[in-house]
């Protein structure tokens, strides 16, 4: 597939963009190529039977024109004309969106593909640098995000075009490295005989890690959620503190591996709901030291900046950038683009 084959014709404005997660669906309306997207009210997915109902609700009472196109990001694989969400009951049906909402075109992308689309536009208060030097212009970028799962995507610059490359990087192997790890890893439950990064580095993985730390320290496991652990760590609970220190160090290891895989001299970006709650632990030395400990390339890794994303919803901004100027990006839409004539 050539870059020319991925060129998207301009969308018919206004374009509705949306980031649909397991709990909330967040939307904005892009009016033209120049103006920022108009933020629309977020909609709890559980409050609506389907995406069409949620879109009607977010537009209701808003002084905006009706959308003519839609670009939506969902958590999960985009295959076929019926796209079930990973963590919600909705099944997104693009042809039903076209028929029910009067749209000309609908494009459905992966959620971390949308995160990658946001990276070239993040700056200022949207991000906080954690070590490294200046990002190189036109160099590859990578985004990794511990949330419900562990999302990952690269953003490659080639032929004057940004190319988002989503994948299943969250399932790479995560084994023990330090003596401390070797005490704890035997207590982490296996999935299919292995421990993938997502089994530890996610909102669901954090209690799993805390339980392993507790058992290794001959303590009773007593945390049931990521929120419990962060609150306990803030109160000085030793198991919770050690859990978050290990979590930060392991996230640094995985982020460093991803950086090496695409030579991400444009920076590695940390997204996801979990990272915002454990930012103090990411700022400490363990995260950055693990990120850089990639012999024989430690010097190279020391130069690569890491950015903690503070933007409340970068995926929507990334989709809006793509909707405004699709020719800036090479996004493969085969099997993911539906039009009114289909």
Predicted regions, residues:
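Short, acidic Gly/Pro/Ser/Thr-rich loop/turn segments
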Residues: 25, 77-79, 149-153, 208, ...
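Short glycine-aspartate micro-motif
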Residues: 15-19, 69-71, 107, 133, ...
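Short beta-strand-loop/turn "lid" adjacent to the catalytic site in phosphate-handling enzymes
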Residues: 62-108, 113, 117-126, 143, ...
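Short, glycine/charged-enriched secondary-structure capping and boundary segments
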Residues: 31-32, 85-87, 122-124, 157-160, ...
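Conserved phosphate-binding catalytic cores of ATP/NTP-utilizing and phosphoryl-transfer enzymes
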Residues: 2-10, 55, 108-141
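Active-site nucleophile and cofactor-binding loops and adjacent substrate-binding regions
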Residues: 44-45, 85-88, 107-114, 133-136, ...
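ATP-binding/phosphotransfer module of carbohydrate and carboxylate kinases, centering on a glycine-rich
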Residues: 1-61, 65, 183-342
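Glycine-rich phosphate-binding loop of actin/hexokinase-like ATP-binding domains
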Residues: 126-197, 279-280, 287-292, 296-301
């Amino acid at each position: 597939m050539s870059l020319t084959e991925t060129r998207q014709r301009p969308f018919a404005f206004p374009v509705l963009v949306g980031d649909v997660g397991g709990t909330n669906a967040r939307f904005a309306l892009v009016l033209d190529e120049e103006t920022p997207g108009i933020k629309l009210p977020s909609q709890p997915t559980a409050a609506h039977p389907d995406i069409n109902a949620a879109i009607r609700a977010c537009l209701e009472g808003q002084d905006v024109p009706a959308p003519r196109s839609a670009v939506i990001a969902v958590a999960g694989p985009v295959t076929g004309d019926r796209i079930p969400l990973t963590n919600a009951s909705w099944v997104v049906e693009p042809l039903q969106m076209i028929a029910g909402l009067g749209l000309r075109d609908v494009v459905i992308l992966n959620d971390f593909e949308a995160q990658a689309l946001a990276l070239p536009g993040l700056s200022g208060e949207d991000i906080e640098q954690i070590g490294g030097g200046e990002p190189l212009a036109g160099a590859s970028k990578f985004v990794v995000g511990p949330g419900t799962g562990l999302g990952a995507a690269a953003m490659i610059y080639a032929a004057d075009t940004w190319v988002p490359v989503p994948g299943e990087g969250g399932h790479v192997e995560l084994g023990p490295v330090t003596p401390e790890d070797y005490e704890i890893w035997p207590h982490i439950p296996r999935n299919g005989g292995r421990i993938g990064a997502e089994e530890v580095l996610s909102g669901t993985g954090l209690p799993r890690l805390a339980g392993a730390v507790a058992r290794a320290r001959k303590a009773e496991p007593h945390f049931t959620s990521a929120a419990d652990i962060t609150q306990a760590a803030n109160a000085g609970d030793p198991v919770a503190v050690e859990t978050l220190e290990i979590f930060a160090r392991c996230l640094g290891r995985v982020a460093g591996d991803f950086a090496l895989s695409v030579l991400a001299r444009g920076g590695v970006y940390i997204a996801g709901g979990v990272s915002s709650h454990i930012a103090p632990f990411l700022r400490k030395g363990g995260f950055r030291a693990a990120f850089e400990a990639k012999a024989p390339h430690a010097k190279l890794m020391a130069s690569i900046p890491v950015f903690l994303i503070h933007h409340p919803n970068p995926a929507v901004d990334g989709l809006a950038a793509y909707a405004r100027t699709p020719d800036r990006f090479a996004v493969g839409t085969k099997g993911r683009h539906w039009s009114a004539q289909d």
